[in-house]
């Protein structure tokens, strides 16, 4: 990470896409995409996804590391080009507990991530706990971040410290996109970014963390990008002009969250304007969902009814029977909710792919299509971009390859933004 930031600060149009997903096909897509490029790949886990108690994936930080390393080994991707990051590390999961208890767990969370070899750590103590006022005083946020930083510094060995980097900042959109309809989005004021840096510098120095300050590589801000279930707010460089100018005077860059679904030109403009770390998550699993839905349509054309996976019906049954991951986010009427379940840009389906029934139906879908030849006309009908790549000879038409390539469509847009020599 330090090398990428140094090159950016030296004037290169270089950034990095942060892949925020625990889906094995998404991780495989990212690693295969850069297998021969020489580029680093940044894969991040969030605190509610992966923590010392297992998170909603059931994985502790060391488990997630081994999970990613296992996929890297299968792909042949060298570990030294992998960067593991932890996102929203702090009291996020324990906001309903008193601050003292939540911070105690947060310290253990940080230690678990650092011990497991995660080198990019987002110190996020912005959320109010059960006995806190709302919102928290910025100095309280910074002092709590310093407590977390101290835990990381004391846990890391000398080799880990060479690679250890921190991201600070609190102004992040709702993880995974907005839950409600958006019309506009508030761009962080440069005075607020400056205050974030200043309060963290004071708090770190109070705690004797002067050396750790040199490891702070980025501040999280809102450059004016967002999405909800049906809309995307695209980057408007002029609205973030003052914010973009301010960071030039520091040794840091910005990290932008919820950059999913922006145009490739927007990614290039974001990196040019020093939002050099671009986080993406739902757009990747949305592409995965599109690929599986497309393959299901092909299956309906090629496989006899009694042999079909029924994957789309199984998804509906599971999500309607177990609505916990989508009910409070999607629209209330039946017809609207079904559209959201299938096609919402916030892609709440992503929480259901590990479900045993859905996983088995996807496996059957792929097995069924592996046993037949996929007609080019059918691929053109349901996956036209992949059809073009087949015609160019850069893709072979297996179900697995089609899924991987569909996910990589998203990564191609990020590469255009993050790599100076990509046309």
Swiss-Prot record:
PANTHER family on file: D-TAGATOSE-1,6-BISPHOSPHATE ALDOLASE SUBUNIT GATZ, N-ACETYLGALACTOSAMINE PERMEASE II COMPONENT-RELATED
Organism whose genome encodes this protein: Salmonella agona (strain SL483)
GO terms under biological process: D-tagatose 6-phosphate catabolic process; galactitol metabolic process; phosphoenolpyruvate-dependent sugar phosphotransferase system
Keyword field: Galactitol metabolism
Lineage start: Bacteria, Pseudomonadati, Pseudomonadota, Gammaproteobacteria, Enterobacterales
Name the record gives this protein: D-tagatose-1,6-bisphosphate aldolase subunit GatZ
Highest taxon listed in the record's lineage: Bacteria
The family this protein is said to belong to: Belongs to the GatZ/KbaZ family. GatZ subfamily.
Assembly notes: Forms a complex with GatY.
InterPro entries xref list: Aldolase_TIM (IPR013785), GatZ/KbaZ-like (IPR012062), GatZ_KbaZ_carbometab (IPR050303), TagBP_ald_GatZ (IPR023436)
Functional description taken from the UniProt entry: Component of the tagatose-1,6-bisphosphate aldolase GatYZ that is required for full activity and stability of the Y subunit. Could have a chaperone-like function for the proper and stable folding of GatY. When expressed alone, GatZ does not show any aldolase activity. Is involved in the catabolism of galactitol.
Pathway stated in the Swiss-Prot or TrEMBL entry: Carbohydrate metabolism; D-tagatose 6-phosphate degradation; D-glyceraldehyde 3-phosphate and glycerone phosphate from D-tagatose 6-phosphate: step 2/2
GO terms for cellular component: plasma membrane
Disulfide bonds: none
